[in-house]
Amino acid sequence: MTEANRILLGVNIDHVATLRQARGTRYPDPLKAALDAEEAGADGITVHLREDRRHIQERDVRVLKEVLQTRMNFEMGVTEEMLAFAELIRPAHACFVPETRQELTTEGGLDVAGQEARIRAAVERLARIGCEVSLFIDAEPQQIEAAARIGAPAVELHTGRYADARTPAETARELARIRDGVEYGLSHGLIVNAGHGLHYHNVEPVAAIPGMHELNIGHAIVAHALFVGFKAAVQEMKLLMVGAASRR
């Protein structure tokens, strides 16, 4: 496989923790899921420590940081609490995401253009500990330009509107937005990733986009794992992605 056809899978294990927190038990263990995902071919593990601690807990992050063989992508709100925690655990990668307490899941991209100074300071702060920051944004030119201006090395394009599209025309339109966003991000020197709402029936067109570096996928894999097991669920997703990327 050439570099142009290579694509990475980041497995988000938040919803393993959601199941655990639903009953306040010690199981299922997100660490076990992470290790199984790595063994099955995941290129990284993504966790989101939310302000309300609805799934992943601080202890999960600390343990994962110590034992992962790949890398941890730490999703976080741009708050003093999370920045201080990131400085403590020193992840290799972090992704800044917008966050509100009432949302079921992240509902849109970060408004980088509307708060450049604040986000620039946060990116620079984590860069000082060797942490590469990506910004979770909508595939809009002004947001991509702002990400490049503030010195973020990477962006993660929000694929929720594509995933939620209800007609073939709407799906095609949203896929084109993502494709244009990847091209525009690359032209600004950014590493371009994507994620949100991707599953086994919609991932291939996104993975096939030239220049797409990594997809972060969680809920679909955790749900499928209930029926086929965690390793098999990860392997199936990776196979779909690699197959699609090979046809670029």
Curated annotation (Swiss-Prot):
One of its GO terms (molecular function) is pyridoxine 5'-phosphate synthase activity. 3-amino-2-oxopropyl phosphate binds at residues 12, 23, 197, 218-219. GO terms for cellular component: cytosol. GO terms for biological process: pyridoxine biosynthetic process. Its EC number is 2.6.99.2. The active site is at 48 (proton acceptor), 75 (proton acceptor), 196 (proton donor). Pathway: Cofactor biosynthesis; pyridoxine 5'-phosphate biosynthesis; pyridoxine 5'-phosphate from D-erythrose 4-phosphate: step 5/5. The record marks 156 as: Transition state stabilizer. 1-deoxy-D-xylulose 5-phosphate binds at residues 14-15, 50, 55, 105. Coiled coil: none annotated. InterPro entries: Aldolase_TIM, PyrdxlP_synth_PdxJ, Pyridoxine-5'_phos_synth. Its main location: cytoplasm. Keywords: Cytoplasm, Pyridoxine biosynthesis, Transferase. It holds the Pfam family PdxJ. It catalyses: 3-amino-2-oxopropyl phosphate + 1-deoxy-D-xylulose 5-phosphate = pyridoxine 5'-phosphate + phosphate + 2 H2O + H(+). CDD domains: PNPsynthase. Belongs to the PNP synthase family. NCBIfam families: pdxJ (TIGR00559), PRK05265.1-1 (NF003623), PRK05265.1-3 (NF003625), PRK05265.1-5 (NF003627). Homooctamer; tetramer of dimers. PANTHER family: PYRIDOXINE 5'-PHOSPHATE SYNTHASE (PTHR30456:SF0). Catalyzes the complicated ring closure reaction between the two acyclic compounds 1-deoxy-D-xylulose-5-phosphate (DXP) and 3-amino-2-oxopropyl phosphate (1-amino-acetone-3-phosphate or AAP) to form pyridoxine 5'-phosphate (PNP) and inorganic phosphate. This is Pyridoxine 5'-phosphate synthase.
